[in-house]
């Protein structure tokens, strides 16, 4: 199973997620951020295989499952799945 530490490319798979082009996730230990185009960071805490966003987005949790060399994610709002995405390690 791959670890979560690192920099991750995002690919939208389904749901009401916006296009994820130009967005990526950076994860270091128990914290990380989704980095939006232009560099704006949306921080989250890493708890097991969940990315729990900090206020004002604390109703959002990304639930991750290992898939191949990356991760399959379900974006949830108030516990309801609103979209799915794939995380692949960024080339260095």
Residue ranges with predicted function:
Residues 16, 29-70:
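Contiguous, well-ordered beta-strand patches that form the walls/edges
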Residues 1-37, 73-75:
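Tryptophan-anchored aromatic micro-motifs
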Residues 7, 77-92:
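Edge beta-strand at a domain terminus
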Residues 1-3, 67-72, 87-92:
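Mature soluble binding/inhibitory domains
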């Amino acid at each position: 199973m791959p670890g979560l530490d690192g920099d991750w490319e995002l690919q939208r798979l389904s749901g009401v997620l916006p296009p994820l082009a130009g967005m990526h996730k950076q994860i270091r230990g128990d914290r990380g951020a989704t980095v939006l185009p232009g560099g704006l960071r949306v921080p989250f805490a890493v708890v097991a295989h969940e990315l729990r966003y900090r206020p004002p987005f604390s109703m959002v949790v990304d639930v991750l499952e290992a898939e191949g060399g990356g991760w399959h994610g379900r974006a949830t709002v108030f516990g309801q799945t609103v979209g799915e995405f794939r995380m692949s390690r960024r080339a260095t």
